[in-house]
Amino acid sequence: MTRIAAFCGLILLSTCSATDPYDQSQVPLEVKPPADFKGKVILVVAGKSSHGPGDHEFFAGSAILCNLLKQTPGVWPIMVRDGWPKNESLFEIAESIVMYMDGRGGHPVVQKDRLAAMDQRMKAGKGWVNLHYAVDYLAKDGKTVLGWMGGYYEPDWSYNPHWDAEIRSLPKHPVTRGVKPFTIRDEWYYNMRFVDDFKGVTPILQAIPPDSTRGGAAPKEVKKHVGASKLETLAWCYDRPDGGRGFGFTGGHFHRNWADEDFRRVVVNAILWSAKVEVPESGAKVEFDAVDLNKNLDKKGKGEFKPILPPMKK
């Protein structure tokens, strides 16, 4: 760690000690826009508490995203907690729905009759954004989600190692506006299950995982499919035939990564794009104070609170 980084860490430590990092009472929840609002509503749904401190901080991460989205004029983000809104009518006024939560069989959208109801909303052209574990679905549910997002993490097919993704280049797309190549460590999933021929899919973030991550307990047919030194898609956009837009982003395991400007800008750009909001040529405004990494956290573990520090630049 450099002297500057260490000094900044000390400042952050002293600042965090003055506030309660677990106080979530100041985050507005399920607040509709005023009746005369003419812009776009974006529903940001945070999952229940998960994993250890600093990982899967869905509530705090979603609160950060809402604050970032508010920096774009004409956008009204609505924050929801615990995986599903108490007022389901919020889905109907949202231009796009963002899910940041645990997935697979416990994914909130696959419970009861929710998948069929959400499918009707998607067919009406609403945006669909899944962040990190929320892109993970069982194959029986993923077949439906393919039509919303163009791809998903399928157990026993996809991989979920922790590694440093080096994003060396970016495609020309509204979602990459203002985003520079970057390298950051995360639990970057790869070998996603995509629609046939990638039709409608635009890879946004791609990198080559270390070959050491390509083993594990995956079936032989998967290992054969995942070749050595293969470029993998870690985030993607999907233009649906119905006119709706989907975005999948496999990062977001480590809460600290929201302090990286390029990391958060590509996500905010994508959310805006999914809601059919014009992304500025220089990218969305994503001003952020690293002190906010230590606000609105879920209380996890029994040990002494350890402040979350921004990631070190690679």
Give, region by region, the residue ranges found by the protein language model.
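Helical hinge/lid and interdomain linker segments adjacent to catalytic or ligand-binding clefts
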Residues: D23, V44, S50-N130, A134-Y137
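Bacterial N-terminal signal peptides
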Residues: A5-T15
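Residue-level signal for short, function-critical loop segments
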Residues: K48-S49, G252
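Catalytic beta-strand/loop cores that center a nucleophilic Ser/Cys/Thr
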Residues: P21-P28, K70, E154-D242
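Nucleotide donor/acceptor-binding cores
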Residues: K40
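A glycine-rich, often tryptophan-bearing local segment used as a flexible ligand/cofactor-contacting loop or short
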Residues: R104-P181
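Extracytoplasmic/secreted proteins, especially bacterial periplasmic and envelope-associated proteins
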Residues: A60, I64, D113, A117, ...
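Extracellular ligand-binding/catalytic regions of CAZymes and related secreted enzymes
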Residues: T19-F37, I64-N67, Q71, S212-T213, ...
